[in-house]
C-alpha cells in the first residue's frame, strides 16, 4: 500500500510541476520578450514576471527534493540540509504568496471605485502601495525565518523514503513552531487577498446601483472590468484557500491514524496553487492568453510533424516490399 501511495504521489507531483512550469514559463517568457522589444515593462507585468520566476524555482525545488529523497534517503535529507531546504522553501513560498497578493491589490486599486479619501489616495499612489507591501513582506519573511529556526525543537514524525522505495516513518528534529509559523504567516497574505476580493465585489455592487447614472458606454466598460477581475480573483481565492487549508491540515496531521495518506494529499494540495494559478492569470490576460494559444498550437504542429516523420519510413518500406 505504501508503494502504491508513493508512486501515485510521484506521478501527481510530476504532472503538477510540468503544468506549473509550462504556465509560469509562458508568463515569464512573454513579459521578458516584451521588455526586450519595448525597453520598458508595466508594473503589473513586473509583478507577474517575478511571480512566475519564483514559482518556477519553487516547483523545481520541491521536485528535486522529492526525487533526491527517493534515491539518496540517508545521504540527502540530513539535519543540516533539512534546515536549508525548509528555509529556502519558506522564502520562495512567501515570495510567491505575497506577489500573488500584490497582484490582487494592484487589480483592486486599478478597477475598484470608492468615494473615499483614503482609497483615492491609495489609488493614485499604486507604486507606493506596492513598495509598502514589499517592505511588509520582507519584515514578515525575516520574522518567519527567525521563528522556524527557533532553538526549541521536538521530535515529530516525518515520512522518509528508503532504498526499497517504501515510505517509512522517521523521527526528525525540526522546529516545533515550523508548521504553526507557516500557517500563521501564510494566512496573512491570504487574508489580504480575501479582503481585496470582498471590497472589489462591494465596489461592483455599488456600481450596479448607480448604473442608471452616467453614459451607457462608461457603465458597460466599468462593469466588464469589475467582472473580469472578479473572475480571476475568485479562481485565485479558491486555489489560495486550498493551499491554506493544506497548511492547517498539516498542523493537525499527527492527530489522525492515516497520517501518510494525509501528508501526501496536503503536499499535492500545496503544489496545486503555484502550478494552477498561472493558468488563471493567463486566462484573465489577453496578451498571455494569445501567447499560450500560440505555444499550444506550435506544440501541436511539432507533434504532427514528428508523427509524420515516424510514419513515412513505414510507408516507404511497405511499398518497397510489394514491388516485384
UniProtKB/Swiss-Prot annotation:
Record-annotated membrane-spanning stretches: 3-23, 56-76, 95-115, 129-149, 184-204, 237-257, 262-282
InterPro entries referenced in this protein's UniProt entry, alphabetically: GPCR_Rhodpsn_7TM, TAS2R
Keyword Membrane appears in the UniProt entry: yes
Protein keywords: G-protein coupled receptor, Glycoprotein, Membrane, Receptor, Sensory transduction, Taste, Transducer, Transmembrane, Transmembrane helix
Pfam families listed in its UniProt record: TAS2R
The keyword Transmembrane helix is assigned to this record: yes
Membrane-topology descriptor: Multi-pass membrane protein
GO cellular component labels: membrane
GO BP field: detection of chemical stimulus involved in sensory perception of bitter taste
Compartments it resides in: Membrane
Disulfide bonds: none
Positions annotated with a glycan in the UniProt record: 162
Ranges per topology, Extracellular: 1-2, 77-94, 150-183, 258-261
Gene3D superfamilies in UniProt: Rhodopsin 7-helix transmembrane proteins (1.20.1070.10)
Regions of this protein lying in the Cytoplasmic compartment: 24-55, 116-128, 205-236, 283-324
GO terms of molecular function: bitter taste receptor activity; G protein-coupled receptor activity; taste receptor activity
Note: Several bitter taste receptors are expressed in a single taste receptor cell.
Protein family membership: Belongs to the G-protein coupled receptor T2R family.
Entry function: Putative taste receptor which may play a role in the perception of bitterness.
Protein name: Taste receptor type 2 member 116
Amino acid at each position: 500500500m505504501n508503494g502504491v501511495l508513493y508512486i501515485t504521489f510521484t506521478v501527481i507531483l510530476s504532472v503538477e510541476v510540468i503544468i506549473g512550469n509550462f504556465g509560469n514559463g509562458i508568463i515569464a517568457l512573454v513579459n521578458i520578450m516584451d521588455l526586450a522589444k519595448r525597453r520598458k515593462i508595466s508594473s503589473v507585468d513586473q509583478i507577474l514576471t517575478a511571480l512566475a520566476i519564483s514559482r518556477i524555482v519553487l516547483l523545481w525545488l520541491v521536485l528535486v527534493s522529492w526525487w533526491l529523497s527517493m534515491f539518496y534517503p540517508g545521504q540527502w535529507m540530513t539535519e543540516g540540509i533539512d534546515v536549508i531546504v525548509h528555509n529556502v522553501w519558506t522564502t520562495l513560498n512567501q515570495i510567491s504568496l505575497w506577489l500573488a497578493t500584490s497582484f490582487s491589490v494592484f487589480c483592486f486599486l486599478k478597477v475598484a471605485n470608492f468615494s473615499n479619501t483614503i482609497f483615492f489616495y491609495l489609488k493614485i499612489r499604486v507604486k507606493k502601495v506596492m513598495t509598502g507591501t514589499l517592505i511588509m513582506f520582507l519584515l514578515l519573511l525575516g520574522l518567519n525565518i527567525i521563528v522556524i529556526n527557533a532553538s526549541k525543537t521536538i521530535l515529530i514524525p516525518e515520512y522518509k523514503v528508503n532504498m526499497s522505495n517504501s515510505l517509512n516513518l522517521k523521527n526528525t528534529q525540526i522546529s516545533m513552531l515550523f508548521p504553526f509559523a507557516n500557517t500563521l504567516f501564510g494566512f496573512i497574505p491570504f487574508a489580504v487577498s480575501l479582503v481585496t476580493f470582498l471590497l472589489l465585489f462591494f465596489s461592483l455592487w455599488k456600481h450596479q446601483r448607480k448604473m442608471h447614472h452616467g453614459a451607457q458606454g462608461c457603465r458597460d466598460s466599468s462593469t466588464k472590468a469589475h467582472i473580469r477581475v472578479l473572475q480571476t480573483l475568485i479562481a485565485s481565492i479558491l486555489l489560495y484557500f486550498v493551499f491554506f487549508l493544506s497548511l492547517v491540515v498539516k498542523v493537525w496531521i499527527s492527530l489522525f491514524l492515516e497520517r501518510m495518506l494525509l501528508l501526501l494529499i496536503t503536499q499535492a494540495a500545496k503544489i496545486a496553487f503555484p502550478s494552477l494559478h498561472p493558468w488563471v492569470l493567463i486566462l484573465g490576460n489577453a496578451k498571455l492568453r494569445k501567447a499560450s494559444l500560440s505555444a499550444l498550437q506550435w506544440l501541436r504542429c511539432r507533434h504532427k510533424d514528428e508523427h509524420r516523420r515516424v510514419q513515412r519510413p513505414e510507408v516507404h518500406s511497405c511499398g518497397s516490399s510489394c514491388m516485384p
